[in-house]
Amino acid sequence: VDDAAGACLGIPALTALHAVLMDGGVTDQTVLVAGGAGAVGHYAIQMALQLGARQVIASVSTPAKAELARSAGADAVVLYKSEPLVQRVAELTQGRGVDRIIEVDLGVNADANAQMLRAGGQCVAYGSSISPMQLPFFPLISRNLQLKFFIVYNLSQADRAQAHSVLDRMLGRGVLQHNIAQRSTLDDIVSAHEQVEQGRLSGNLVLQIPHQT
């Protein structure tokens, strides 16, 4: 793994991998990855497929991001700003719903998630743009839906070791794409920060620092 790819891994890759691995993993499951072109989502698509998911659906906001999700291997992509997400997921799963949702923004998507999960399904949330938030309690409890939360900084030693071991094997086999949208130098650091802050890039911006001799 080169330095640029290594810079992309860190928190996003471990977050994606734990979201896929937790509670027994996703073998033979249908998984919806919210934000499938994001730093975490792009890895989560690939990792879910590598670890046995039967079908991976991604939700994204733009056609350009849809292409990124497809390049990561998503079996289907829904553009949630122009398509009815709940209806499309129902169609893609023949009305059954998904087994697991890997969720980047629970506060925004909680109501839709309760409709898209199968009975007994699980939403694994690692982020929310809204806090505090309202949850659809009765739709959740009436269908035995599960909400799981985690932040990668507070993983147990066992969970962290498991994720590191699986990630090492994936990297050794060269099966992961690393979504690098732009490479910049320290001379362009102001512009680089502005682009990240303004969300102009679909992917990671990597700063290349010359090696000192």
PLM feature spans:
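Glycine-rich phosphate-binding loop and adjacent beta-alpha segment
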Residues: 60, 108-175, 209-213
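A generic alpha-to-beta junction signature in SAM-dependent methyltransferases
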Residues: 24-25, 93, 105, 117
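NAD(P)H cofactor-binding loop motif with strongest signal on the N-terminal glycine-rich segment
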Residues: 35-36, 105, 128
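N-terminal Rossmann-like NAD(P) cofactor-binding module of classical short-chain dehydrogenase/reductase
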Residues: 99-102, 124
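Local beta-strand N-terminus motif with an aromatic residue
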Residues: 28, 74, 97-98, 140, ...
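Short amphipathic alpha-helix with an adjacent loop that forms part of the alpha/beta core around
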Residues: 84-95
